[in-house]
Amino acid sequence: MIKGGTGGGNTKTGLIYEGKVDLATFIAEQKNYTVEGNNVLYKDECVAHVFKKHDFYKYLKTQGINWQDHISKQLLPDNAIYVIVNNTMFILEVKTQNAAGSVDEKLQTCDFKKKQYQKLLFQLNMEVEYIYILDDWFKKPQYKDVLDYIISVGCQYYFNYVPLQKLGLPVPE
């Protein structure tokens, strides 16, 4: 199911993803995709670069960006993927839950975090998109307000789904 609670596991535009493995491993398991280091290849052509946690900051350093010049504390993304064709860094945060708890409040921080990533990447003229990949727990009615908020501040969410087409990545045949 995609954001807003509509649609379904549309394998023509994306892939079902349950967050049980990191994004690089997941992508490498898909038809015509390989991952070499941080490089994502589709049919042997580099289409993206994928980062997890501290690897994101290693990448920034290779680009001449000192994170401390822009933000006061590192944010460690679950997954970040820079898609070359649309010059966009997608921050993908996987959130799973099986009881009410701290993840509830974390969903409300996407606006702040997206702005922090924008500060880090503005010198590279990259766009930033912040996307939650949520499990079915968050389909409960008590999350309607927070899900509406996520959309209202320019962030996105999907349920158990990586929207390859939305990211600008080729969809496996």
Language-model segments: what does each one mean?
Residues 59-62, 93, 171-173:
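Short glycine/proline-rich turn/loop motifs
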Residues 32-33, 155:
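Short phosphate-binding/catalytic loops that engage adenosine nucleotides
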Residues 103-122:
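Short, charged, amphipathic alpha-helix that recurs within catalytic cores of restriction-modification
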Residues 79-97:
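Conserved catalytic cores of phosphodiester-cleaving nucleases, focusing on short active-site segments
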Residues 122-173:
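Domain-level recognition of nuclease-like catalytic cores that cleave nucleotide substrates
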Residues 33-85:
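Active-site metal-binding core of divalent-cation-utilizing nuclease and nuclease-like domains
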Residues 93-107, 133-137:
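Short beta-strand-loop-alpha-helix junction that forms the active-site gateway
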Residues 1-32, 40:
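Nuclease catalytic cores
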